[in-house]
Amino acid sequence: MPLFFSLVLLILGLHCAPPNSCEGKITSCLSPQQNATLYKMSSINADFAFNLYRKVTVETPDQNIFFSPVSISAGLAMLSLGACSSTQTQILESLGFNLTDTPMAEIQQGFQHLICSLNFPKKELELQMGNALFIGKQLKPLEKFLDDVKNLYETEVFSTDFSNVSAAQQEINSHVERQTKGKIVGLIQDLKPNTITVLVNYLCFKAQWANPFDPSKTEEGSSFLVDKTTTVQVPMMHQVDQYYHLVDTELNCTVLQMDYSKNALALFVLPKEGQMEGVEGAMSSKILKKWNRLLQKGWVNLFVPKFSISATYDLGGILLKMGIQDAFADNADFSGLTKDNGLKVSNVAHKAMFYIGEKGTEAIPEVRFLNQPETTLLHPIIQFDRSFLLLILEKNTRSILFLGKVVDPTEV
């Protein structure tokens, strides 16, 4: 049962700015039914994910990367509800939306359906996206904003005394720990005294492989090439089974799809040696659609490392480079959130945790492993023994739940 956790933290600091107004009628979440807007959003969100990924690689070259694009998108879209004028426009355009083609109400309705679809109960798949908004007691949020974040983003809103920094920090950390079932502890360690609003977005995902690995076939101490001069030893899971896979000769990479038991899949992308940057630069929603069209099922002699990684990012600088500038400036316009005093974003933190194994963190009762063919010489060998990309997708919405690069699987 691979287990994933993601958390987006948006911290807004108090500052003075003249109030303004913004309008837009928002509907409430009625059902998880998908629509044309949702499918349109999947491509837009995917391109945002890869654009963000490329910015992260510049900031953290040659390191493990792991984050939840859909969590970040939802957190920023939710923030845009309280933004107005160019502050709102920059947030939405950085996400890939053109307000001329897609009105604000349609964008928010799309996220409404996305969150409803992701949170809709599914057998054998635990998937929950959640939000929490901690607002300073001295702040008077607009009723419309509170209604919208509750109806659209299923957000809990808490009135918090930020004048007591340690107590506010404990309140937020305790909430996050409860919601992630103890997987994220002590998230905030240095809450700033001028903080007045904290927005938390998290995504919890737990699923069982459709075809679990046999632990007895895991090879301890297998070599994994980190770079030309560095090799580490990792447990390497092994299985001979039928998988959807392909060799993309244009991008010089091998793609393998591993299905979960219900409504989710993992894409493992293995570039040829020296071709990682080329693959990273080409990733897009169009590439995903091409792979989805060309993947074919066949026998594979598969080797995948067993590992866990976690990553924490301050996305403020990256989002600035992606076009979100006013939100961090003194002229930020969040008059859609409150008429008291304006706000500006002081920090955007994101944390994601990842574990993958034969059965995961919990035992799977009565797992039966199918007999594998003795002769494997004719089956192609796909061995993830060097840096590779990893995508976790939800099938119904085609949303990228998680996106990452494994450079060193021994780094936790």
Swiss-Prot record:
It holds the Pfam family Serpin. This is Thyroxine-binding globulin. Thyroxine binds at N292, K395. Residues 1-16 form the signal peptide. One of its GO terms (molecular function) is serine-type endopeptidase inhibitor activity. Major thyroid hormone transport protein in serum. Belongs to the serpin family. The gene is SERPINA7. It comes from Ovis aries. The lineage of its organism: Eukaryota, Metazoa, Chordata, Craniata, Vertebrata. It is found in: Secreted. Glycans are attached at N35, N98, N164, N252. Expressed by the liver and secreted in plasma. Keywords: Glycoprotein, Secreted, Signal. Coiled coil: none annotated. PANTHER family: SERINE PROTEASE INHIBITOR, SERPIN (PTHR11461), THYROXINE-BINDING GLOBULIN (PTHR11461:SF375). GO terms for cellular component: extracellular space. SMART domains: SERPIN (SM00093).
